[in-house]
Amino acid sequence: MEMEKTNRMNALFEFYSTLLTEKQMNYMELYYADDFSLGEIAEEYEVSRQAVYDNIKRTEKILEEYEKKLHLYSNYVVRKEFLEQLQQYVQETYPKDSEIKKYIEQIQEIEE
């Protein structure tokens, strides 16, 4: 499994997990977050590996569809980049202005 896909699925899962069924959440968490194999998940839930595989593939598509419609993750990434640029600009241009730094920190806390 490639790392980029794993990271993306984990990120999408963080944003949209509450929209999934309990079984979808459990399978995705075990597979992506806990690095369980299909066989281990199948054994845990007493189902076939194929059933686990199908469920995970369906759930991946569902997560991608949610992102395509809602853009929560992509908007988060853009906001994070802008915030980093703002922070760098303030640090270079207004290094002694603690008030601006405080506001940036508050925004960062909201984003996390």
UniProtKB/Swiss-Prot annotation:
HAMAP family: UPF0122 (MF_00245). This is UPF0122 protein EF_1701. Might take part in the signal recognition particle (SRP) pathway. This is inferred from the conservation of its genetic proximity to ftsY/ffh. May be a regulatory protein. Belongs to the UPF0122 family. NCBIfam families: PRK00118.1-1 (NF001066), PRK00118.1-4 (NF001068), PRK00118.1-6 (NF001070), YlxM (NF045758).
